[in-house]
Amino acid sequence: MPSASITLPSEAEVVIIGGGIVGCSIAYHLTKRGINDVVLLERKQLTCGTTWHAAGLVSMLWPTPTLTNLAKYCHELYASLEAETGQATGYRRIGSVSLARNLERLEELQRNSSMAKVFGVESEMIDNKRLEELYPGINTDGIVGTLYIEKDG
Protein backbone atom coordinates (compact mmCIF):
# COMPACT_ATOMS: atom_id res chain seq x y z
CA MET A 1 0.00 0.00 0.00
CA PRO A 2 1.55 3.37 -0.97
CA SER A 3 2.23 5.62 1.97
CA ALA A 4 0.83 9.12 1.98
CA SER A 5 3.24 11.98 2.47
CA ILE A 6 2.81 13.24 6.01
CA THR A 7 4.51 16.30 7.40
CA LEU A 8 5.20 15.94 11.09
CA PRO A 9 5.35 19.02 13.28
CA SER A 10 8.82 19.94 14.53
CA GLU A 11 7.51 20.15 18.09
CA ALA A 12 4.45 19.25 20.14
CA GLU A 13 3.37 19.56 23.74
CA VAL A 14 3.01 15.77 23.94
CA VAL A 15 4.49 13.10 21.67
CA ILE A 16 3.22 9.56 22.12
CA ILE A 17 5.24 6.70 20.66
CA GLY A 18 3.09 3.73 19.71
CA GLY A 19 -0.44 3.62 18.34
CA GLY A 20 -1.71 0.59 20.20
CA ILE A 21 -4.52 0.61 22.72
CA VAL A 22 -2.42 2.41 25.34
CA GLY A 23 -1.07 5.09 22.99
CA CYS A 24 -4.49 5.73 21.45
CA SER A 25 -6.08 5.88 24.90
CA ILE A 26 -3.52 8.38 26.15
CA ALA A 27 -4.03 10.60 23.08
CA TYR A 28 -7.82 10.39 23.42
CA HIS A 29 -7.88 11.19 27.12
CA LEU A 30 -5.35 14.03 26.83
CA THR A 31 -7.48 15.73 24.18
CA LYS A 32 -10.58 15.19 26.32
CA ARG A 33 -8.74 17.11 29.06
CA GLY A 34 -8.02 19.99 26.70
CA ILE A 35 -4.45 19.14 25.70
CA ASN A 36 -4.76 19.34 21.93
CA ASP A 37 -1.12 19.65 20.84
CA VAL A 38 -0.67 15.87 20.79
CA VAL A 39 1.20 13.84 18.19
CA LEU A 40 0.72 10.07 18.08
CA LEU A 41 3.47 8.22 16.21
CA GLU A 42 3.00 4.70 14.87
CA ARG A 43 5.42 3.11 12.42
CA LYS A 44 2.73 1.24 10.48
CA GLN A 45 -1.00 1.40 11.16
CA LEU A 46 -2.87 2.19 14.38
CA THR A 47 -3.41 -0.89 16.56
CA CYS A 48 -1.55 -3.13 14.08
CA GLY A 49 0.93 -4.53 16.61
CA THR A 50 0.25 -6.34 19.86
CA THR A 51 -3.18 -4.72 20.22
CA TRP A 52 -4.26 -6.20 16.88
CA HIS A 53 -3.32 -9.71 18.05
CA ALA A 54 -5.23 -9.43 21.33
CA ALA A 55 -8.58 -11.18 21.69
CA GLY A 56 -10.36 -7.89 22.36
CA LEU A 57 -12.23 -9.16 25.38
CA VAL A 58 -13.41 -6.60 27.91
CA SER A 59 -14.33 -8.22 31.19
CA MET A 60 -16.40 -6.39 33.79
CA LEU A 61 -15.02 -8.31 36.78
CA TRP A 62 -11.50 -7.85 38.13
CA PRO A 63 -9.92 -8.75 41.49
CA THR A 64 -10.00 -5.22 42.94
CA PRO A 65 -12.63 -2.47 43.07
CA THR A 66 -10.26 -0.07 41.28
CA LEU A 67 -9.72 -2.40 38.31
CA THR A 68 -13.42 -3.27 38.19
CA ASN A 69 -14.34 0.43 38.12
CA LEU A 70 -11.80 0.97 35.32
CA ALA A 71 -13.39 -1.90 33.38
CA LYS A 72 -16.85 -0.39 33.87
CA TYR A 73 -15.54 2.93 32.54
CA CYS A 74 -14.04 1.15 29.52
CA HIS A 75 -17.36 -0.51 28.72
CA GLU A 76 -19.14 2.85 28.82
CA LEU A 77 -16.42 4.48 26.72
CA TYR A 78 -16.33 1.74 24.07
CA ALA A 79 -20.12 1.82 23.81
CA SER A 80 -20.05 5.58 23.10
CA LEU A 81 -16.96 5.89 20.85
CA GLU A 82 -18.69 5.07 17.59
CA ALA A 83 -21.34 7.75 18.09
CA GLU A 84 -18.71 10.25 19.23
CA THR A 85 -16.14 9.64 16.49
CA GLY A 86 -18.10 8.14 13.60
CA GLN A 87 -15.56 5.30 13.52
CA ALA A 88 -16.77 1.72 13.79
CA THR A 89 -15.20 0.10 16.84
CA GLY A 90 -16.67 -3.38 16.54
CA TYR A 91 -17.46 -3.30 20.25
CA ARG A 92 -20.30 -5.60 21.26
CA ARG A 93 -21.54 -6.74 24.65
CA ILE A 94 -21.96 -10.45 24.03
CA GLY A 95 -21.41 -11.75 27.55
CA SER A 96 -18.93 -14.26 28.90
CA VAL A 97 -18.98 -17.60 30.63
CA SER A 98 -16.43 -19.19 32.93
CA LEU A 99 -16.82 -22.94 33.22
CA ALA A 100 -16.17 -25.25 36.17
CA ARG A 101 -15.29 -28.88 35.58
CA ASN A 102 -14.59 -29.67 39.23
CA LEU A 103 -15.81 -28.58 42.66
CA GLU A 104 -12.70 -26.52 43.42
CA ARG A 105 -13.23 -24.42 40.29
CA LEU A 106 -16.96 -24.19 41.06
CA GLU A 107 -16.19 -22.72 44.49
CA GLU A 108 -13.83 -20.21 42.84
CA LEU A 109 -16.56 -19.14 40.40
CA GLN A 110 -19.07 -18.83 43.24
CA ARG A 111 -16.61 -16.56 45.10
CA ASN A 112 -16.19 -14.52 41.91
CA SER A 113 -19.96 -14.21 41.61
CA SER A 114 -20.18 -12.95 45.21
CA MET A 115 -17.34 -10.51 44.55
CA ALA A 116 -19.16 -9.29 41.43
CA LYS A 117 -22.21 -8.42 43.50
CA VAL A 118 -20.06 -6.46 45.97
CA PHE A 119 -18.47 -4.56 43.05
CA GLY A 120 -21.84 -3.90 41.39
CA VAL A 121 -21.27 -6.21 38.43
CA GLU A 122 -24.28 -8.23 37.33
CA SER A 123 -23.45 -11.93 37.20
CA GLU A 124 -25.14 -15.22 37.82
CA MET A 125 -24.30 -18.85 38.33
CA ILE A 126 -26.16 -20.80 35.66
CA ASP A 127 -26.89 -24.47 35.12
CA ASN A 128 -26.13 -26.48 31.99
CA LYS A 129 -29.64 -26.03 30.62
CA ARG A 130 -29.22 -22.23 30.63
CA LEU A 131 -25.69 -22.57 29.22
CA GLU A 132 -27.07 -24.61 26.30
CA GLU A 133 -29.73 -21.94 25.70
CA LEU A 134 -27.02 -19.27 25.50
CA TYR A 135 -24.60 -21.35 23.41
CA PRO A 136 -26.53 -23.93 21.37
CA GLY A 137 -24.42 -26.94 20.54
CA ILE A 138 -22.02 -26.56 23.45
CA ASN A 139 -20.91 -29.85 24.99
CA THR A 140 -21.79 -29.59 28.67
CA ASP A 141 -20.45 -33.02 29.62
CA GLY A 142 -18.42 -32.67 32.79
CA ILE A 143 -19.42 -29.05 33.45
CA VAL A 144 -20.55 -28.69 37.08
CA GLY A 145 -21.30 -24.97 37.01
CA THR A 146 -20.91 -21.76 35.03
CA LEU A 147 -20.46 -18.11 35.91
CA TYR A 148 -22.24 -15.90 33.37
CA ILE A 149 -21.55 -12.17 33.04
CA GLU A 150 -24.06 -10.86 30.51
CA LYS A 151 -22.52 -7.42 29.96
CA ASP A 152 -18.97 -8.51 29.19
CA GLY A 153 -17.78 -7.38 25.77
Language model feature labels by segment:
Residues 2-12, 125:
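C-terminal lid/capping helical subdomain adjacent to the catalytic/cofactor pocket in oxidative enzymes
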Residues 30-31, 116:
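Hydrophobic alpha-helical packing residues
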Residues 56-134:
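Dinucleotide-binding Rossmann-like beta1-alpha1 core, especially the glycine-rich loop
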Residues 8-22, 39:
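Beta1/beta-strand and adjacent pyrophosphate-binding region of the FAD-binding site
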